[in-house]
Amino acid sequence: MSKPDRCVFGGPTKPNGNCTVAGDDGLPVQCVGPWAKDKHDYLRRYVEATKAARSKFLTPSGGRPAGGAAYVELFAGPGRARIRTSGELIPGSPFIAIEHAGAPFSRIVLAERDKANVAALLKRTDALDGRVRIVSGDCNERIDEIVAQIPEHGLNIALVDPYGLGPLRFQTLRKLASMKRMDLVIHFPTMDIKRNLGRAGGFITRFLGTERWRDVVKKPEDVVKLVEILRSQLAAFGYEQEKVRDLPIKQSTNAVMYHLIYATKDRLGNKIWDTIARTTAQGQRGLF
């Protein structure tokens, strides 16, 4: 929806969000802003902070088999990224889960529609054990296959981080949200919607699964109200509306780039997220 970004290497970002210059391993890398490191930091701290709860699902108990624990990404990208303002190469978000050793996920499900990214993911995860499942194709069309890979009785988390607003449909979120234990971390592209509000109507409706937003969003300044509508939509699946958290991620000018929305059906999960949100990636006091 928005104009392609330019990075320090010159040239616009590719339509799939990748940098024009490959990584040092010769494979594609996603081109991201420096604020991506903030998102990764929150996710990394969350994965670490939930290891005690997750470990209970990784071992048999009371004669019952282990429930398991899955990490899911609907828009996994190529597995590595480059900060467009500095050229720094960083691991993609899938590797936050892959490399976590405290209470390792029993299943890692990565969905990606771009063929070049799928090929890069396959190569970058080739030496790993059999935990990783890569689903090639549009996550909206392959969601049943994705859900089939997730432990039904496990403690699971899904990162929903689309490149822009267009690729995601609420029906896809609904399939994940209907699972008994599924924490959601959703990238909500607030600034992108503000910049393109006049032509983003169809995208917003598909993302939120409702037309109600048209009654409350009349100008770009109203876009933040969309977050509340998404919260109310998730409430239908057991995520208490007042407990669905939204964390604004800002750029260097202090403008909000996007909201990182966290939803859980578990009281402990909210407590953990609130603790994490109190401190930013730079060690500053956060919102709570």
Show the residue positions of the predicted features.
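SAM cofactor-binding core of SAM-dependent methyltransferases
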Residues: 41-145
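Short amphipathic alpha-helix with an adjacent loop that forms part of the alpha/beta core around
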Residues: 142-151, 174
